[in-house]
């Protein structure tokens, strides 16, 4: 069946029920080629690569989201509503804010505060709190414990800007217990909530906002490997 999307050339049935979603489409390609068995590419439009393969005998897809709330909002909306995807697991990097957060830590985002206006479209009579699927979150926490990863479950902040003109923002986030900042999760959680589907973000801390410390390219890859193992096990378990 042909799906009415200008951004995804897949047909119904090409995409699995659970999708891993890194921001970088080249990372999606890397994961497909190195972690999935018999990956098949289902999308190349705008170079937003998408693949479906198997992991430990279960069908899993991976597709890039691009950067920012509008981009992940578009791709996740189509996956949920046009391609019958049940669960999306974002995998990406984040900047650590809380003093307890260290480089290479994995943060499992329970909720995502945001300064994005993305939720305005829903005319919700109040301030909606974008939250993860508890089922996916529990699977991820269990997977992290199983492999011995240092994973922290808590709240993050999804920013609409990378370069913030307000130098006090990060300190204000920290005062409210925010662990880390990134640019996509709230959009994913809002889209999932509206569609009645499941979503989770699993993030590697690649830099620390207040100290300026950051991982090298090789160190980022090591941290990414741990995050990927957690995400794959979470996806696999969600298909039980």
Language model: regions and residue ranges:
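Zn-dependent metallopeptidase/amidohydrolase metal-coordination segment
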Residues: 186-220
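Active-site rim beta-loop-alpha module in soluble metabolic enzymes
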Residues: 127-176
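His/Asp/Glu-rich mid-to-C-terminal helical/loop segments that flank catalytic regions of hydrolases
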Residues: 209-240
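Metabolite-binding pocket within alpha/beta catalytic cores that recognizes anionic/polar moieties
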Residues: 1-130, 134-136
């Amino acid at each position: 069946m042909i799906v009415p999307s200008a951004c995804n050339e897949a047909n119904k049935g090409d995409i699995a029920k659970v999708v891993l979603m890194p921001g970088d489409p080249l990372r999606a390609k890397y994961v497909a080629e190195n972690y999935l068995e018999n990956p098949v590419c289902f999308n190349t439009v705008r170079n937003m690569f998408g693949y479906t393969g198997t992991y430990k005998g279960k069908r899993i897809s991976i597709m890039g989201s691009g950067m920012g709330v509008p981009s992940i909002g578009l791709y996740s909306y189509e996956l949920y509503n046009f391609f019958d995807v049940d669960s999306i697991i974002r995998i990406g990097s984040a900047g650590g804010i809380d003093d307890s957060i260290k480089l290479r830590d994995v943060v499992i985002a329970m909720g995502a505060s945001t300064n994005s206006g993305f939720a305005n479209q829903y005319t919700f009579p109040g301030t909606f709190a974008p939250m993860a699927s508890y089922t996916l979150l529990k699977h991820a926490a269990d997977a992290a414990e199983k492999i011995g990863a240092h994973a922290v479950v808590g709240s993050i902040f999804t920013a609409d800007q990378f370069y913030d003109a307000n130098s006090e923002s990060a300190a204000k986030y920290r005062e409210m217990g925010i662990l880390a900042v990134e640019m996509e999760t709230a959009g994913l959680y809002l889209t999932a909530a509206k569609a009645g589907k499941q979503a989770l973000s699993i993030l590697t801390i690649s830099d620390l906002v207040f100290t300026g410390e950051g991982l090298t390219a090789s160190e980022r890859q090591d941290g990414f490997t741990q995050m990927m193992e957690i995400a794959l096990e979470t996806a696999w378990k969600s298909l039980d």
